[in-house]
Amino acid sequence: MPAKRSSKKPSRKTASRHTPTSLDPSFLLPSKDDLHLMIEDWVAEDVGLQDLTTNIMIPAKAKADFLMNTREDIVISGIEVAAEVFRHIVPEAKVKTLIKDGVLAKKGTSLMRIAGPGRGLLTAERTSLNVLQFMCGIATLVREYASKIDHTEAQLIDTRKTVPGMRMLSKYSACVGGCRPHRLGLHDGVMIKDNHIAVHGSITKAVAQARALTPTLTKIEVECDTLKQVEE
């Protein structure tokens, strides 16, 4: 059964303007305590009071030992997150990851081996697969896009248009795929968009307002819709 929610309130990881210059995205991953809170929410959403089918069909003392394999070519992202789902829901499970994030895994590659109580592992399986598929899907698509500009000096930048609650895992996966991290939230930089420009009447006035009211070293960017705006 899922572990009880801890009363401990971990400190949430806050964003910083000083992002790493390398493409090591590990700073984007949640702390272990924060990840466990996320897992508890995922399990509560999926399992509810119990995994009714598994508890009916699988004997209480049954054991399971299986490999998690990929069905298509994918860029791995979130392998340790997926493994932690099993470890958290089934503490007695033995979980061994067989591949690292960032690797292009060919169809049929074994990603993880899991052994332990059958009921618990079956209950945890879909949650683990869902988060792994979500993260690998992002990394795989981004890798495809990034490969298109490998021969140029252009950089692929991510956004904050993410599924609520999944931002850091999404941005981590985008970076694994080849993106550069942009703002982690509304708090860590000024980005002037069409609505802001409309209020002030021009980019020049909007930028002047931003410069007047933000600390000197705060990064200010303008999202342009036309070449004329770029020139301004």
Question: What residue spans do the PLM features occupy?
Answer:
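Acidic/glycine-rich phosphate/pyrophosphate-binding loops and surrounding catalytic core
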Residues: P2-E232
